[in-house]
Amino acid sequence: MQCALYDAGRCRSCQWITQSVNEQLSAKTADLHRLLAGLPVEQWCAPIGGPEQHFRNKAKMVVSGSVEKPLFGMLHRDGTPVDLCGCPLYPASFDPVFSALKPFIARAGLTPYNVARKRGELKYLLLTESQFDGGMMLRFVLRSETKLTQLRAALPWLRAQLPQLRVITANIQPVHMAIMEGETEIYLTDQQALAERFNDVPLWIRPQSFFQTNPTVASRLYATARDWVGQLPVRHMWDLFCGVGGFGLHCATPQMQLTGIEIAPEAIACAKQSAAELGLTRLHFQALDSTQFATAQGETPDLVLVNPPRRGIGKPLCDYLAQMAPRFIIYSSCNAQTMAQDIRHLPNYRIQRVQLFDMFPHTAHYEVLALLRRSI
């Protein structure tokens, strides 16, 4: 992938950009083999790649500069701003949005936040696009509610320029820290969730719910999990750290009893909406801590699927799963190092198959899916 920002030395986020995609996949595969060394693997499935560029469905832009000439991108550690509107990871459909937002900021009087002076209102712009219908969600991350009236008054102009904006919010983040969002979300549109669809499964994206940033590879990840579960005798399944329900909604059948657990209420609201659309009445999603939920249960499902954050599921949940002893565990991870640590805390399980998904091209990161079968 060619990137003018990288060539000019202005951005180094894609640290592997000088390597070919095949070289990157080989290096990531070797890393996964290294991390799982000593753990018997029955089947290594071929790695899954995706597009080299224009694949991201989300932009997280620091806003700097002035109200008349705002700049969208990032700040180096010394405070130097870098315009990332031309980042080749973004789809071309983002270009008109960035172009319209620059004059809009002046219209709304949204002064960019100055980190050094601790002054200004607009901190970030968060843009998400649905690959299903091209609809977009735009979030203005503000220091306070001071400019809300002006923002609301100027919105008709922006929506006339960009009818693809379905969901618009103001997120209030008052803390002088590099935190992307605050707890308060104020909806500026009637629609509150963005419709997405992977493999004919309806999904919903809300402002504070996690959603994969590479939809092409994510859809293949979910489809693979569905295929694996479909080959197993599963009538009762848990989907822990379920997010908006992507895995559970793909794997569920009308006869299956499935419980999805996620600590974020916004994500659970999305999962419930999708389950209702699919008519799956035996799916139950709850906003709870996954470890606390699991350790409080007296029943053992046939399969437990876990999709934890980078820190992994941790030893307490590993110990409980080992004691509870479901027949199968599917582990989806964005950090193979913590996944390998967790699997080593499950001594009575063998890795039946494992597959790498190149969710994050041009970086050292990748997603991995592993199917574990109880050996005794």
Swiss-Prot record:
GO molecular function annotation: 4 iron, 4 sulfur cluster binding; iron ion binding; rRNA (uridine-C5-)-methyltransferase activity
Pfam families (alphabetical): tRNA_U5-meth_tr
EC number: 2.1.1.189
GO BP annotations, alphabetical order: rRNA base methylation
Classification via InterPro entries: 23SrRNA_MeTrfase_RlmC, MeTrfase_TrmA_AS, MeTrfase_TrmA_CS, SAM-dependent_MTases_sf, U5_MeTrfase_fam
Positions that bind [4Fe-4S] cluster: C3, C11, C14, C87
Enzyme class: transferase
TM region(s), chain numbering: none
Residues at the active site: C334 (nucleophile)
Chain sites annotated for binding S-adenosyl-L-methionine: Q212, F241, E262, N307
Gene3D superfamilies documented for this protein: 2.40.50.1070, Vaccinia Virus protein VP39 (3.40.50.150)
Assigned keywords, A-Z: 4Fe-4S, Iron, Iron-sulfur, Metal-binding, Methyltransferase, rRNA processing, S-adenosyl-L-methionine, Transferase
Name assigned to this protein: 23S rRNA (uracil(747)-C(5))-methyltransferase RlmC
Species: Salmonella typhimurium (strain LT2 / SGSC1412 / ATCC 700720)
